[in-house]
Amino acid sequence: MKKIGFVDYYISEWHANNYPVWIKQANEKLGTDYEVAYAWAEQDLSPVYNETTDEWCAKMGVSRCNTIAELCEKSDVIIVLAPSDPEKHLGYAREVLPFRKCTYIDKTFAPDFATAKEIFEIAEKYGTPFFSTSALRFADELDTLKGATDLIITGGGGNFAEYIIPVGRCIEC
């Protein structure tokens, strides 16, 4: 069993609440063996769901870590979340990537090019494999928009930069 550690600004948010189920579903479909086992959050109380890190961990069956270093030592794979706070990713990358464990950094990857470049440089320095993507890249539902001549895009999210991806997918269609 490969242990996944979540690093987040506040842990009770949409991605952290849904990824564990999706990972279990992927295990069943692909025959893999991963589980979200550890979590660390910079901010204890989620401003979105009003849930503490301890409450989230108890609900999800995950062990809370007191530091990012503790989480990295215990985990086989790291997922840096904070999808609504990409300005946090560089600081988390500075702590996570030296552990040389495969790391996923959630979208929006970085707030600007300079920050993204620095994250890549840190990963290269330590030889750490990492990636970032959006599940929306694989949303077949958006394929139905191909050939549309008029389009209105609506959506949630905290800011335009965070949710530019659906716009890009619609333009691509």
Positions of predicted regions on the chain:
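A general structural motif
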Residues: 1, 75, 100, 127, ...
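N-terminal Rossmann-like dinucleotide-binding module
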Residues: 1-57, 149, 154
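Alpha-helix N-cap/loop-to-helix initiation residues
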Residues: 12, 45-46, 85-86, 112, ...
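Short, well-ordered alpha-helices that flank and scaffold nucleotide-derived cofactor binding pockets
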Residues: 21-25, 98, 121, 173
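Beta-loop-alpha module in the N-terminal Rossmann-like domain of NAD(P)-dependent dehydrogenases
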Residues: 30, 60-120
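A short acidic, often aromatic-flanked loop/helix-cap motif at beta-alpha or helix-coil junctions
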Residues: 45-47, 69-74, 138-140
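A contiguous active-site-proximal alpha/beta segment in oxidoreductase catalytic domains
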Residues: 104, 109-168, 172
